[in-house]
Swiss-Prot record:
DNA damage among keywords: no
Organism, as annotated: Danio rerio
Gene Ontology cellular component terms for the protein in this record: axon; lysosomal membrane; membrane
The protein, known as: Sodium-coupled neutral amino acid transporter 7
Keywords, sorted A to Z: Amino-acid transport, Cell projection, Ion transport, Lysosome, Membrane, Sodium, Sodium transport, Transmembrane, Transmembrane helix, Transport
Organism classification: Eukaryota, Metazoa, Chordata, Craniata, Vertebrata
Keyword Nucleotidyltransferase: no
Annotated membrane topology: Multi-pass membrane protein
Length: 465
């Protein structure tokens, strides 16, 4: 509900519901969020999601491809203790960030993440936020294509009942071929349409696939295969700075903040108190899933664990092959949805630059949409063909995820409190201080992870001096 007694921006245009195409991207990671109807100004037509339904949607929005990288993140952090401790320390900020966004959504009467940032923090930060969302979705699309290349050759080997050495002899199991063929024949046709109508199916597959992978990793740790032997299992980080290596994966895994704003507004009672319960339960569920996968996957393979944990299992394992099939289906159906969100944001920025609200020329919109899709698709495909594993991508976009979790919510909280005309009490000072802490932590994570990722790419490049 709008709070007219609290001024956020003096510009009247920042308060109304935006019709920008870029601000109609109701979903970032999870297909299910897009199925939530945008809220109307009438209370009677404001969504009807129950608290239990909201928990399901938030969990679905958080769980995703980052799950496969958690065992490797625990290894990079220096062991289970360091990885779990880091997760627990970040959990408080992750949950409060979700609550802050809901509070600012109420104050500004806006219904999507980028709209809230734009209304509360101003147009400049709104544009930066939209660009960050576009880059984030672009990077996630690259990660999806890499996962296809990682899993499809081993899935083919399982179907043909062939060993690892035999798989590599076939031209049709070459990683670049499988990524290109799958992308051109399936993903590209699904990405071109203006609207996406298969979200609910992708949502169901995503949930089933994620939980199945977690169960398989845990079961395979309890009853390991004879062909699997773990490497060295570190019990502590070699250096205290190694702990920060897990931050991109944790941020990428728990980032559901962009999707959370429309979920909050879709609830039967979009109020802060029930929302606290929703996000707390959701993040606890995610914590158990990620920790279970990370701990069991790490203990199964130790320091030899792959960036994609499923790559560490033998290709002839039927149960793991089913997990690979689930993951491939999930990413194939999720790529078009992520692309839709990124394309919608870019379209909104373009229309705003032109000073228009909507594109009235249907033919012009169609040509631009096809061009945007082809450029996006070709760039993500080319990069996926030459990036060796998802760890490289997550290490970069994990820093952006930290901005969505820490920086933008912190800035929104600071600006919202500074705009209040009430007496500035101790609680007011504490809230502003907390916002400053969130921005500082987020900026540190973004800077540290991005710099570290670039540095590692440089030193691992054989052509570097």
């Amino acid at each position: 509900m709008s709070r007219p007694d609290r001024a956020i921006n003096s510009e009247a245009g920042d308060w109304g519901y935006s019709e920008d195409a870029g601000e109609r991207a109701w979903l970032l990671q999870s297909p299910s969020v897009d199925s939530v109807q945008p809220p109307s100004q009438s209370d009677d037509s404001r969504g009807g999601t129950s608290s239990l339904g909201a928990v399901f949607i938030v969990v679905n929005a958080a769980l995703g491809a980052g799950l496969l990288n958690f065992p490797a993140a625990f290894n990079m952090a220096g062991g289970i203790t360091a990885g779990v401790t880091l997760q627990m320390c970040m959990m408080a900020f992750i949950i409060t960030g979700l609550v802050i966004l809901a509070y600012c959504s109420q104050v500004s009467n806006e219904s999507t993440y980028q709209e809230v940032v734009r209304a509360v923090c101003g147009k400049a930060l709104g544009v930066i936020c939209e660009l960050a969302i576009a880059v984030y979705t672009f990077g996630t699309c690259i990660a999806f294509l890499i996962i296809i290349g990682d899993q499809l050759d081993k899935l083919i080997g399982a179907i043909n009942n062939e060993s690892e050495k035999e798989i590599s002899l076939h031209w049709y199991t070459d990683r670049k071929f499988t990524i290109t063929l799958t992308s051109v024949l399936i993903i590209l046709p699904l990405s071109i349409p203006k609207e996406i109508g298969f979200q609910k199916y992708a949502s169901t597959l995503s949930v089933i696939g994620t939980w199945y992978v977690t169960i398989i990793v845990i079961v395979k740790y309890i009853w390991p295969s004879k062909d699997v032997s773990p490497g060295i299992i570190p019990v502590r980080p070699a250096s205290w700075t190694d702990v920060f290596n897990a931050m991109p994966t944790i941020c990428f895994g728990f980032q559901c903040h962009v999707s959370s704003v429309p979920v909050f507004n879709s609830m039967k009672k979009p109020e802060i108190r029930p929302w606290w319960g929703v996000v707390t339960i959701s993040m606890i569920i995610c914590l158990f899933v990620y920790t279970g996968t990370g701990v069991c996957g790490f203990l199964s393979f130790g320091s030899s664990v792959s960036q994609d944990v499923l790559m560490s299992y033998p290709s002839d394992d039927v149960a793991v092959a089913i997990a690979r099939a689930f993951i491939i289906i999930c990413v194939v159906t999720s790529y078009p949805i992520l692309h839709f969100c990124g394309r919608a944001v870019l379209e909104g920025l373009w229309l705003r630059f032109k000073g228009e609200e909507v594109e009235t020329d249907v033919a012009k919109e169609r040509r631009r949409r096809i061009l945007q899709t082809l450029v996006w698709f070709c760039l993500t495909l080319i990069l996926a063909l030459f990036i060796p594993d998802i760890g490289r991508v997550i290490s970069l976009i994990g820093g952006l995820a930290a901005c969505f979790i820490f920086v933008f919510p912190g800035l929104c909280l600071i600006q919202a409190k500074l705009s209040e005309h009430d007496v500035r009490s101790n609680s007011w000072n504490a809230m502003v201080a907390y916002g400053v802490i969130m921005v500082t932590i987020g900026a540190f994570i973004f800077g540290q992870t991005t710099t570290n990722a670039i540095y590692k790419d440089i030193i691992n490049n054989p052509n570097s001096p």
